């Protein structure tokens, strides 16, 4: 976070080595996760962290389960407005811990481990949330606010999400113009051509929401919950304050 119009030093934000994230949105209309308000009053901004966690992450196990603690998010019921990554993460961590099978839910297990290795600093205790897996709506806002293209403008709109065959490179460059200021650009993981981010949100029993970025293609759409190994899936941790 770099408030104001300060001057860059060598193309970088002064003190950039201490940066921990980039604000995705501070629009009150998008700060809809009521559990964030209840747990800490963290309804000022959603922030994307500057590194990935995990690797080859499946969302959940096979046989597939329609998770009772999560809503099924479709385009018809407003997937783009689901800003509840924290609520969904907390619900899944609690549910899987109670069942003793969190290790079978690799994306959520990864964020749980990341919380342990990257805890909220003691000086910020109570002032920001723990890390969480972002929801479909929070990734929608990353694309709209940081990448310069709302998924609503994608030209391959389909029943399971949004896809565009050529916006990917332009959007990748735009967000990295900002992340390069703190020397933390997005990096390509899939055969040096793309990256696959897991969302917290479920679509139905066998499908979850994901971001697939294989330049020049970009998509925010549903994939099989067991797609992790095929796409070398990772989580991009978020927090709120």
Where are these regions (language model features)?
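Short, compositionally biased
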Residues: 1-127, 224-241
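C-terminal, surface-exposed recognition/capping segments
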Residues: 136-241
């Amino acid at each position: 976070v770099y408030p104001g119009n300060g001057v860059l030093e060598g193309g970088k934000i002064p003190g950039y080595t201490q940066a921990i994230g980039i604000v995705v949105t501070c629009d009150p209309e998008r700060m809809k996760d009521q559990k964030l308000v209840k747990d800490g009053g963290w309804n000022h901004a959603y922030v994307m962290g500057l590194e990935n966690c995990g690797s080859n992450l499946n969302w959940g196990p096979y046989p597939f389960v329609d998770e009772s603690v999560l809503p099924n998010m479709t385009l018809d019921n407003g997937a783009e407005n689901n800003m509840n990554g924290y609520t969904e993460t907390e619900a899944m961590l609690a549910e899987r811990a109670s069942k003793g099978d969190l290790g079978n839910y690799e994306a959520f297990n990864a964020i749980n481990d990341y919380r342990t290795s990257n805890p909220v600093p003691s000086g910020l205790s109570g002032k920001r949330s723990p890390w969480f897996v972002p929801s479909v709506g929070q990734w929608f806002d990353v694309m709209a606010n940081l990448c310069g293209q709302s998924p609503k403008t994608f030209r391959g709109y389909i029943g399971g999400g949004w896809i565009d065959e050529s916006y990917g490179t332009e959007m990748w460059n735009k967000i990295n113009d900002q992340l390069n200021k703190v020397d933390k650009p997005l990096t390509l993981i899939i055969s040096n051509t793309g990256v696959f981010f897991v969302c917290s949100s479920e679509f139905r029993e066998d499908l979850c929401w994901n971001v697939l970025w294989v330049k020049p293609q970009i998509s925010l759409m549903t994939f099989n919950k067991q797609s992790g190994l095929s796409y070398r899936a990772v989580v991009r941790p978020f927090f709120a304050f």
